[in-house]
UniProtKB/Swiss-Prot annotation:
It is found in: Cytoplasm. This is Gamma-glutamyl phosphate reductase. Signal peptide: none annotated. Catalyzes the NADPH-dependent reduction of L-glutamate 5-phosphate into L-glutamate 5-semialdehyde and phosphate. The product spontaneously undergoes cyclization to form 1-pyrroline-5-carboxylate. It comes from Pseudomonas fluorescens (strain ATCC BAA-477 / NRRL B-23932 / Pf-5). PANTHER family: DELTA-1-PYRROLINE-5-CARBOXYLATE SYNTHASE, GLUTAMATE SEMIALDEHYDE DEHYDROGENASE.
Amino acid sequence: MTESVLDYMTRLGRAARQASRVIARATTAQKNRALLAAADALDAARPELTAANEQDLANGRANGLEPALLDRLALTPARIDEMIEGLRQVAKLPDPIGEIRDMRYLPSGIQVGKMRVPLGVIGIIYESRPNVTIDAASLCLKSGNATILRGGSEAIHSNRAIATCIQQGLAAADLPPHVVQVVETTDRAAVGALITMPEFVDVIVPRGGKSLIERVSRDAKVPVIKHLDGVCHVYIDVAADLDKAIRIADNAKTQRYAPCNTMETLLVHSAIAERVLPPLAAIYRDKGVELRGCAQTRALLGAGVLEATEEDWRTEYTAPILSIRVLDNLEQAIEHINTYGSHHTDSIVTENFSDARRFLNEVDSSSVMVNASTRFADGFEYGLGAEIGISTDKLHARGPVGLEGLTSEKYVVFGDGHVRT
């Protein structure tokens, strides 16, 4: 009799729960040995990885997959190099598990502190990019968590080949293979099962399109670490340095269009708009960026700027399109960001300390910046070493989620025969 999807996922969940108890007590040396051995296994398996990936690419082309998605799916030699180096870099990161902080003596005589511990079992759901398999597996392993990885069906052969290398790394460190498991069925029912197993899964991390994340957020019976959109802003204040403003607004939009930390709306103080918008518009037009603006923007820049609609202010384009709005003061800029933004990343360009502090205090986003491009909102750029994603939620992890974001804390108490009176 064929095993049902629910039975299969339950089997994976049960095995992950058992493995989570083993990896939680693994030593730092043991975890690092697994990561380095997995890196060596990937290096040795380049022909197998390439063959598996070619099978996925052929299937993708046959199924009419868009060129951009085919590019994300491809495991080029350079991307395999990056995966190998990624494993080695995670092995070098400090191990957060077991760290005790804030120890203090209380009047009762007991000593109380907090110890950092793994979350347990992490389910990760993602699309297209097989390199996410390595990113997710390595961070979960180093943080002492077991993980169940459900990649996109278009990358199934690549993910299986990568998983084989990870299993070899686990075996080399005498760790159970179920510490990292890849879902090998392409049946979409596997996602529904994974997000509704609170007895086996402690948290879900979805990485992909908005529809996937909305579905997971709506249907999950376990906590979810996620962000829906990346509607990021740069506000050019009246006290901005013009050279800095132009450089930042250019980079935030045009360095790359697809990432979630790319600027989608540019806000400009009316007193500086006439000096900063024309040179910026020339840069954007040279780079093929379509401009959509408010009435003041269109009056200033003339023909070629489309009228921005209410929907534009809320849209993550992930394309060479930019909305521009001219405002009269900082208060209006903050109000616009908190109304239309996605609580991801927003930046102010200003030389006024009070304006900068007010922006930092009042903008309700996971990353708030002063005189820096929104493109810096990234775990690597923040010195986290790597990230599993970015969270715009307010509970547990917020912003780029690195090793520490995949852990929790428990109180530890030391006494010497103390009893409560």
